[in-house]
Swiss-Prot record:
Source organism (scientific name): Phasmahyla jandaia
Protein localization: Secreted
UniProt keyword annotations, A-Z: Amidation, Secreted
Any Gene Ontology CC annotation: extracellular region
Tissue: Expressed by the skin glands.
Modified residues annotated as Leucine amide in this record: L17
Name recorded for this polypeptide: Skin secreted peptide P5-1
Primary subcellular site in the record, as a coarse category: secreted
């Protein structure tokens, strides 16, 4: 799960852009 957290954050950041 810890490996999924940064992936989710980066995906959210891409959605904001």
């Amino acid at each position: 799960l810890l490996g999924m957290i940064p992936v989710a954050i980066s995906a959210i950041n891409l959605m904001k852009l």
